[in-house]
Amino acid sequence: DEVQTDLNAGRAHPSVALLPVVGALRERLEVERGGVSLNLPGQEIIAENGTWRTRFRSPLPVERYNAQVSLLTGMAAAELMVGAAVGILRTLPAAAPEAVDRLRLSAEALGVDWPVAQSYPDFVRGLEPGEPAELAVLARCASLFRGAGYQSFDGSLPEDDLGHAALAARYTHVTAPLRRLVDRFASEICVSIGQGEPAPRWAREHLTELPELMAASNRRARAWEHAVVDLAEALVLQTRVGEVFDAVLIDVNPRSGMGTFQIADPAVEAKLPADGREPGRAVRVRLDEVELNEGRTVFSYAA
């Protein structure tokens, strides 16, 4: 927040003064490549006045620009490893045409205009999460980003596609070696390549293990994150049992019929059977129960 404030006021530190220029140029190149980023608000937990609260928050421009620099680093690292035929890339398969067709039908059902000639990336970039129907479409867009994983190689490139469909480029993780295991391996391999030396033996010996290790790690991290958010929501709502809240149904699982809805204030996301309701619809929900020890909240539709 401070960096964005300083940039807006024209007093940014020289080390970040050019970040908006570089970030905007990278965003333009992303558009030209056919890449796409989902502008879904993230849910945050904030300590405030001796208590906790939750909020939905979209990234600041400076955060988007910083992310573009990280992506640029990962793309450059990926090209180094592909050129040396040793390393590990972050991959994402392209969405199946029928999945895009289903998304187009969903947008039509929600009353969100998607011109026939407009590509999927261009359509997604124009969606506004502040509009309930468009937020519902954005939530459904996440289904097109499934299948992300890692592909390792040593000595020759695999026949599988090494691209990342959302970025429309080859990409790897190298910017967070202290919190993400794969970055530790990828960054050391890139340092060796840059120095004209062979990749470290210890890194090469474990390359084939990394994709499954990272898959397991990501599953555990997501479960932990969801549990923390659930507990924070229960803390925020523990004194409000019986209250009715305005909410938006943002998604419905086509198989189970379970709906996901968002309450703006306090920022809560929970589930209820949709019972035939369509995504994008405004609903009123009642908080029936809070189980703090389990981090569980129970809602029902208000009459």
Task: Describe each model-derived feature in a short phrase.
Residues 1-281, 290-297:
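Electropositive polyanion-binding surfaces
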Residues 299-303:
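Short, compositionally biased
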